[in-house]
Amino acid sequence: MKWKHLPLLVMISLLTLSKKHLLLAQLIPDPEDLERGNDNGTPAPTSDNDDNSLGYTGSRLRQEDFPPRIVEHPSDLIVSKGEPATLNCKAEGRPTPTIEWYKGGERVETDKDDPRSHRMLLPSGSLFFLRIVHGRKSRPDEGVYICVARNYLGEAVSHNASLEVAILRDDFRQNPSDVMVAVGEPAVMECQPPRGHPEPTISWKKDGSPLDDKDERITIRGGKLMITYTRKSDAGKYVCVGTNMVGERESKVADVTVLERPSFVKRPSNLAVTVDDSAEFKCEARGDPVPTFGWRKDDGELPKSRYEIRDDHTLKIRKVTAGDMGSYTCVAENMVGKAEASATLTVQEPPHFVVKPRDQVVALGRTVTFQCEATGNPQPAIFWRREGSQNLLFSYQPPQSSSRFSVSQTGDLTVTNVQRSDVGYYICQTLNVAGSIITKAYLEVTDVIADRPPPVIRQGPVNQTVAVDGTLTLSCVATGSPVPTILWRKDGVLVSTQDSRIKQLESGVLQIRYAKLGDTGRYTCTASTPSGEATWSAYIEVQEFGVPVQPPRPTDPNLIPSAPSKPEVTDVSKNTVTLLWQPNLNSGATPTSYIIEAFSHASGSSWQTVAENVKTETFAIKGLKPNAIYLFLVRAANAYGISDPSQISDPVKTQDVPPTTQGVDHKQVQRELGNVVLHLHNPTILSSSSVEVHWTVDQQSQYIQGYKILYRPSGASHGESEWLVFEVRTPTKNSVVIPDLRKGVNYEIKARPFFNEFQGADSEIKFAKTLEERPSAPPRSVTVSKNDGNGTAILVTWQPPPEDTQNGMVQEYKVWCLGNETRYHINKTVDGSTFSVVIPFLVPGIRYSVEVAASTGAGPGVKSEPQFIQLDSHGNPVSPEDQVSLAQQISDVVKQPAFIAGIGAACWIILMVFSIWLYRHRKKRNGLSSTYAGIRKVPSFTFTPTVTYQRGGEAVSSGGRPGLLNISEPATQPWLADTWPNTGNSHNDCSINCCTASNGNSDSNLTTYSRPADCIANYNNQLDNKQTNLMLPESTVYGDVDLSNKINEMKTFNSPNLKDGRFVNPSGQPTPYATTQLIQANLINNMNNGGGDSSEKHWKPPGQQKQEVAPIQYNIMEQNKLNKDYRANDTILPTIPYNHSYDQNTGGSYNSSDRGSSTSGSQGHKKGARTPKAPKQGGMNWADLLPPPPAHPPPHSNSEEYSMSVDESYDQEMPCPVPPARMYLQQDELEEEEAERGPTPPVRGAASSPAAVSYSHQSTATLTPSPQEELQPMLQDCPEDLGHMPHPPDRRRQPVSPPPPPRPISPPHTYGYISGPLVSDMDTDAPEEEEDEADMEVAKMQTRRLLLRGLEQTPASSVGDLESSVTGSMINGWGSASEEDNISSGRSSVSSSDGSFFTDADFAQAVAAAAEYAGLKVARRQMQDAAGRRHFHASQCPRPTSPVSTDSNMSAAVIQKARPTKKQKHQPGHLRREAYTDDLPPPPVPPPAIKSPSVQSKAQLEARPIMGPKLASIEARADRSSDRKGGSYKGREALDGRQVTDLRTSPGDPREAQEQPNEGKARGTKTAKRDLPPAKTHLIPEDILPYCRPTFPTSNNPRDPSSSSSMSSRGSGSRQREQANVGRRNMAEMQVLGGFERGDENNEELEETES
């Protein structure tokens, strides 16, 4: 946009406008654009590539300018005090924006404001500080800054940038302290630097030099310096250094002293002395500092007054006693540690007997054992000898198989297989270094006794309580060999059976009758055999009288467990035997516990209970004697009792003492173990819980049985804990892994050899620290509270985790204070010795969660449970119930980026779905742009415009669409909403019931059509199909017609290229169809180039006798002839169906051309959607409006290719000729109807131009010759030909390919009319109807005069609202043209807002006959033509109503007529037909210029039936019923059933027609139009034109009245009623029907109901 065209004042004012005003200002049109506009001030249209699609261009003020944008944002700065600083900010914009700085919301003063200011605003927009001013009280430069860039288009704000002044205080918050550690121990120094900003970093210096932190032993973490393994070289002076950008600060000096633990130079040795001797232990150690020495006794105190410690640290004990024996430890200790060395003092003591042997009596052959046990120090050796014998038996001697004598390790003498010679004394002697003692015992041998186990009591007595005088029964069942003897004892006294009350049965049961109180006591059953005895006891209580006694409940044997299996021995040791058994689950109850009994001769002669209440099936019996034979049995028990005993186990012998320990010299063992020296290596750390220990033995000994590894935690925190022992019993091993250690703990470890109870000297102590792990428990007692010192700070406190879960040394604690957004997060880290932290600067209103975790060297551990806190605006904590409010939770969720992204994505998806739906909806609307206006609102009708095409070298105006019509395709036609199948070619009935044969076919065969064009199309299609054996669908009835692809075929044309009623393309050739002239041009080019498929066969009748064909058929054939004239090289050009493209050379199909039209008549209805049901009509039927056939057929030329004779076209067995599959409509039809009905109104939105069809809301006229002159000859021809149609033989063609899909056309005489009533006009009153009648009659006369003069007529009446009709503002105007001008009449002056479609008068005269034929009384006026013949002005042929027509703006004059009442009864069908036939005028005479080879005879026309008013009235009622039902499908069927399209028949042979006078009406001549007399003012019923009712052939018998399976239920009653004889209707019937009034319909309804 050029600025020079705008006033300067506007430019200045625009600089101050906001963005919103600028957008409005951009819509100001440019003056040059206004000058280029139309004269009336409308904006000039822009070119296709213009960005402005509104048709005008707006002002673009300073198009190159744009608002500011920050390209470089300032960043945070930390500057030292007094130092210069720069905050960068760069912005771009046009004009160049100005930059200002703000701090804390206030504008920053720079040198531009005050030259003395230390702040400078650089040209780039950066803010430069000459120096940073910062004091204790005044801090002018510190704060948060933003830069703002502005120009007249707006402003841009940068990000926040904080400028902070760096500080570093002098005093350290914590100075490192002196450290004193031992070599090998870790050293830790802690330092907290001075407060500063930014937080200073920490480094260390040693002896004035930076500390080398590359040493892997040295770790600097936070303020801590850790040396893991100190050396002597680590000693020195250490300084902590804190550094930030201000400088550095040094802490106080800390001394690190590395000391040495004590280590022994000479360890004490084990000693063995005799009683009353002295014992000395020497000890010598070194260390730094020099250690101090001490002695202690491990298991007691040093003997008082008998020990001394010499200056050389030697321990001396005088007069040693046996109590002094033990382990003595030398302790060397200094300030960094201590060392210990132990030695054992052994005091030798003379032996003494502990167990002396006793005399034994044993049976011959048995085994006997003498026990002898002695103690002493050292342990005395025991040996046996038989008195009088020198053979000694020692315990350490290996057993000899030939000897029956042996001595156990404990000193017991055992004699097996005793013989009588073994009788005598046996001497036990014990001996050690301190002395010896002797004892003896006598062995007596008796007779042989069976070596059997003692008896076993299977079931013994149970405790009982009985009343006085009650009966007691005590059972005792025992087994043994021999049978055991059972005795009963009471409280240890044998029960006497002399008392008559007491009786012992043979089975051993003891029975006591008449019990007394004295019978109370413990009863014992003893079962005895020579091998031993068994006992079982029970307590019996006798109660006095009056005391309730619970009698013993008899025990069910099934409730007691069964005996377990025989126990098996699984393991045997010196004093332990392990048994295994299984319960008996096959019988008895499940046991809950077990009882184990054992027997051994070494322990006595009876069974002993060794274990009770055993819960498992395996048990280890301990405490057994070594080298003894044992027998075992097991009993099962539960709450109900004890089971029988199991089988006795096999004998098992416990192990003897190992022979290696026999005969050992204790002093020698102790001496050798004391000389063993172990060297322990540094332990290897394997994991956090295991350490591997290695050692070497300097001096091996045969008495090393194993090693004991002793370990314990070390450190002050653990104190002097006890040593833990891990034994290694393999002398050859020199390493072991100690498991189950604590994590991160320092251990001290040592090793010690041992032999039985003897132990050697300890090795040196080694230290090992297990690996650390993260703490496995969170800190305890975490609390969050308000800090008193700061308004927005909180105090977090905690306690360390439990020690066993720390898994190392806690080095620090991490504190997380998390807000609901990351910008509010605050994290803190404190030292491991700190248990609280203050977190400042919390944002009020933000809910924080605080978590604490302890951190070791392995990292942070488990976090504590979140503690929530929220501060209000005053800094006070909010109560917990308020913290987690629903609003806060919702706010937290809404602020989450994921939620925002999800909402955005959902909105985008919804928008895309809606856009797709809207696009598809609009696309369907555009696709339905070929639908007629109001197709979804009111059943209406649209007629076909006049189209010119070439015929025989001259332009001929066709009243129909110049397109192929074919209904022979399957039921997939896009123009049918409820596509019902057509009849197949197997049907013999004629396609249109125009002359119902005498076979009696009634209305059941009636085929309903949506429009007269459908009837005409089907008439010709069926004729062609009869000739070609085309396969047709099954049904004869169609539903709603989908006209979505046909709107472009219904257009009016107004173009200078219209010549003589023909459209002439720029090349001079007439175009058959205005909207498809480009396609026709391509077709012409294609035909000239030999286009088309030469192999495609064309329709050609067989060479048989020709019959004359109706002019309708001739019109189609003539057009086919025209198309064939375009062929080149005899190549046949297939005609194009309306809804299919011919091929790629056709230039596009009619369908594609129509879609592009975007006419406004589509109303956005979907393709294929069923149209709504027709509203009520006042008895009107569109069949009344169907015009007669043309009176002047075109001349015959090459008729064998384009048409067929009557012989070829008609089947002898058919009631009427079959329509051809392809047909064109003829101009003459329009001419003869135009004169009768007035000018043809166009469909809205259609226009024509020489090059293409233009679509707009401007009105165009239709060049249509007035067809009024053509009406009277049809009136004359029709009655003679009706009902007398001959039946020529069947002539069929053989098709090569199926015909293209059908394209319905509107007949020329109906183009542009509205056939359906307005929805708003359905329920009008009778007075309004009378007024409309008067208006219609006045308009008729006026329109008649206009038509005679060939003038334009502008409609003036409003025809309904926009909801249910197409208003005049949305459609084109129309007008008629005089033929003498040969040019288009001017555009109609229809206003875009007048809301009219056509005049009431013109429409009224077109529907007058329809109204009266339907049973309405209409004021009729007769008119006289040039010849003086009287005729009616309205059309006489009935025309069916179309439910899908776009003529939704029917004139109110027609709609609002009241239904006539019936005045007289119906006459019989034949009478009616005769009466009507007699009153018909003679047929017309065709002009000589047009000759038809196939004109039907008058007799043929007479043979055709007509459509009676009964059908019309019935259909009208069906229409009203369907409207009341709200458009239900049933109503729809009723609507479809009554839409009968009657095809007009041909007027007869043209030769006869030429001979008959035309009474001054010469069709196609201008004179005839000028000379028409004024219209008659009244019409008479006799002038109603008869019309044929169409029908389809059915799949049944041609004469089967039920072949129409898809007929409407509304029409079925009428068809059944007339089935007997309605094949043809005579003229008398029509005459009677024409006189119907309102009452006729009522009677008809009664008749229909009765039928």
Swiss-Prot record:
Disulfide bridges in this chain: C89-C147, C191-C240, C283-C330, C372-C428, C476-C525
Region (Disordered): 31-66, 1086-1107, 1137-1337, 1352-1397, 1420-1651
Record field: transmembrane: 898-918
List of residues that carry Phosphoserine: S940, S1055, S1297
Localization in the cell: Cell membrane; Cell projection, Axon; Endoplasmic reticulum-Golgi intermediate compartment membrane
Assembly and binders: Homodimer. Dimerization is mediated by the extracellular domain and is independent of SLIT liganding. Interacts with SLIT1. Interacts with SLIT2. Interacts with FLRT3. Interacts with MYO9B (via Rho-GAP domain).
Protein name stated in the entry: Roundabout homolog 1
Species: Rattus norvegicus (Rat)
